[in-house]
């Protein structure tokens, strides 16, 4: 059975977890109504593409 050979330090564990962050989705303003929407999707407020 696999067991850790040595204990990892707090810093090493934190460095490994730097890639666990949530990606921010890109948002743009709708050219029709000015509301924020995701690119290449229908605007939720006015329905314009």
From Swiss-Prot:
InterPro entries assigned: Ribosomal_bL32, Ribosomal_bL32_bact, Ribosomal_zn-bd
Keywords: Ribonucleoprotein, Ribosomal protein
GO biological process entries: translation
Keyword ATP-binding among record annotations: no
Keyword field contains Ion transport: no
Pfam families: Ribosomal_L32p
GO molecular function: structural constituent of ribosome
GO cellular component: large ribosomal subunit
Record family assignment: Belongs to the bacterial ribosomal protein bL32 family.
Designated name of the protein: Large ribosomal subunit protein bL32
Organism of this sequence: Nautilia profundicola (strain ATCC BAA-1463 / DSM 18972 / AmH)
Lineage: Bacteria, Pseudomonadati, Campylobacterota, Epsilonproteobacteria, Nautiliales
Gene (name only): rpmF
């Amino acid at each position: 059975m696999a067991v850790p050979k040595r204990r990892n330090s707090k810093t090493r564990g934190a460095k490994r977890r730097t890639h666990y962050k949530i990606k921010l989705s890109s948002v743009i303003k709708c050219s029709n109504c000015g509301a924020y929407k995701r690119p290449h999707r229908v605007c939720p407020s006015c329905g314009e593409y």
